[in-house]
């Protein structure tokens, strides 16, 4: 069993390296706690180019709208055209309370955002430690959200899919 797991990890690493060299995948290091407990500082993830409209729960990598070259990793909670309301610690999309099994802590402060057809509303899973999400920087333009996180490859004990 141990050798088959090692072989699988070597195969995965080879595939990641090959695809990354061909520009189909991107490696990314998680540097902050805003996505904990899903993603922790020191985790390494794989992202693929985002080709279709994001779904609620997808984790995206996008450039900070006010700091060129600085990228953020956040989860989609509001979809294009929706109204997102944060009230009494809960997130609502078009008047429905969202089930957010990934969220760590209540969502504050209260507010209302009407999303344009080409924008999404993103939040960090660790709501108390996520300063660079849509509560503070506004909705994210889909043009800027170029990468979708699809898996974690480090640490070895946490290898696998991430997201929903």
Where are these regions (language model features)?
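Extended hydrophobic leader/signal-anchor segments used for secretion and membrane insertion
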Residues: 1-164
């Amino acid at each position: 069993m141990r050798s088959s797991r090692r072989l699988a990890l070597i195969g995965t690493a080879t595939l990641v390296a090959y695809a990354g060299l061909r520009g189909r995948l991107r490696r990314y290091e998680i540097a902050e706690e805003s996505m904990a407990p899903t993603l922790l500082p020191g985790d390494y993830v794989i992202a693929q180019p985002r080709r279709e409209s994001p779904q609620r729960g997808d984790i995206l990598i996008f450039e900070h709208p006010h700091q060129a070259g600085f990228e953020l990793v956040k989860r989609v909670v509001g979809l294009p055209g929706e109204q997102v309301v944060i009230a009494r610690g809960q997130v609502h999309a078009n008047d429905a309370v969202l089930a957010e099994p990934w969220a760590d802590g209540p969502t504050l402060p209260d507010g209302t955002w009407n999303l344009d057809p080409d924008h999404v509303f993103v939040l960090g899973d660790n709501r108390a430690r996520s300063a660079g999400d849509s509560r503070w920087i506004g909705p994210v333009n889909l043009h800027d959200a170029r990468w979708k996180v699809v898996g974690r490859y480090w640490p070895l004990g946490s290898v696998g899919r991430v997201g929903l």
